């Protein structure tokens, strides 16, 4: 049984904790969170932390967790501005690290994380969950295999209400704003499905204040050969539920995924009713955490979700910001590594 320490038990930390309850090979044994005493008293956590929160060792400072516990790996679910610091500390302690997306706020921090993983010779994986999302994977593999003929276009979108006034995410110096925190899901998926584009042209803005960062963006990715690819994202000061969509056109089919659909995916052919595939398997969080645990257990690198790919996802967002500010398309080679 793998012994796991979770660093940060907020919204995403609880989502990850839920996934560990579905795995036979791993168990959370320690949690670090500034609210440790408050959380330890929360009976609702018993279902997330079997055999119960009283069996968990709690820490307010993740450094104490790293120095005191006998662990096989850590799962870092802290706010974005703390990702690099915590991941590097874990790796320097000799522990494999799963880190929530985005990798970090700055490319130099991403590079420092990659360097720390190489020096420690321990796996580092960033949790870009769309790489493990069954419907998105069907879209990608259909393009690779030309299951419906050649891919012609892909439009991705996601949006939500702006985080609450008390949330650290409203401060772009801590979260990167919607363009980095929310939009990076689709940015990373584009490079996963299609590789790195040659150029990016983006439009967007800060609807409220510069402190909140770019909260709406539309980016077009140039792959040449007539392939049309775009992704958009919004934080809006309205009561908008979180939602996401993908519209993908192949020569012989149109795939439409929408978070308001059940099932999520519809496949339209030339005639007849759309196909409604029922995809088996676990949710994306469980898939990615199982993959990470397998990586740790087998002592190999996370080839499906490498640190370099996570770093380049941040680089592509930086390219979008540069395009918005310059008002012209930009070459991605300025922002990505190979």
What are these regions (language model features)?
Residues 26, 73-75, 111, 122, ...:
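C-terminal helix-rich "cap/oligomerization" subdomain common to oxidoreductases
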Residues 123, 130-210, 327:
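Predominantly a Rossmann-like dinucleotide-binding segment in NAD(P)-dependent oxidoreductases
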Residues 16, 54-116:
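Beta-loop-alpha module in the N-terminal Rossmann-like domain of NAD(P)-dependent dehydrogenases
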Residues 278-290, 305:
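Active-site loop of classical SDR/Rossmann-like NAD(P)-dependent oxidoreductases
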Residues 1-51:
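N-terminal Rossmann-like dinucleotide-binding module
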Residues 99, 124-126, 231, 257:
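Hydrophobic residues in well-ordered beta-strands that form the structural core
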Residues 181, 187-264, 289-301, 336-338:
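Contiguous beta-strand/loop segments that form the cofactor/metal-binding neighborhood of enzyme cores
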């Amino acid at each position: 049984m793998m012994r796991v320490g979770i660093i940060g038990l907020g919204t995403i930390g609880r989502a990850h904790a839920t996934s560990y309850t579905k795995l036979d090979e791993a168990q959370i044994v320690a949690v670090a969170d500034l609210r440790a005493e408050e959380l330890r008293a929360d009976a609702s956590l018993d279902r997330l932390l079997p055999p119960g929160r009283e069996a968990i060792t709690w820490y307010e400072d993740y450094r104490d967790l790293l120095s005191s516990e006998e662990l096989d790996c850590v799962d870092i679910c802290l706010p974005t501005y703390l990702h690099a610091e915590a991941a590097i500390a874990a790796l320097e302690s000799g522990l494999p690290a799963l880190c929530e997306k985005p990798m970090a706020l700055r490319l130099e921090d991403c590079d420092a994380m990659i360097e720390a993983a190489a020096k420690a010779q321990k796996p580092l994986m960033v949790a870009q969950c769309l790489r493990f999302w069954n419907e998105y994977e069907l879209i990608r593999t259909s393009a690779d295999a030309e299951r419906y003929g050649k891919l012609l276009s892909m439009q991705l979108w996601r949006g939500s209400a702006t985080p609450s006034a008390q949330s650290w995410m409203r401060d772009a110096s801590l979260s990167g704003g919607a363009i980095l925190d929310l939009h990076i899901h689709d940015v990373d998926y584009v490079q996963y499905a299609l590789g790195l584009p040659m150029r990016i042209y983006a439009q967007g803005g800060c609807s409220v204040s510069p402190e909140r960062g770019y909260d709406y963006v539309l980016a077009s990715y140039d792959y040449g050969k007539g392939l049309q690819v775009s992704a958009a994202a919004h934080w809006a000061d309205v009561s908008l539920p979180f939602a996401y969509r993908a519209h993908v056109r192949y020569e012989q089919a149109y795939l439409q995924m929408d978070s308001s659909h059940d099932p999520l995916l519809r496949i339209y052919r030339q005639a007849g009713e759309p196909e409604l595939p029922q995809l088996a398997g676990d949710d994306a969080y469980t898939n990615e955490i199982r993959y990470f645990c397998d990586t740790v257990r087998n002592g190999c690198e996370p080839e499906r979700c490498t640190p370099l790919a996570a770093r380049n996802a941040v680089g592509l967002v930086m390219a979008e910001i540069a395009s918005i500010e310059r008002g012209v398309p930009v070459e991605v080679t300025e922002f990505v590594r190979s």
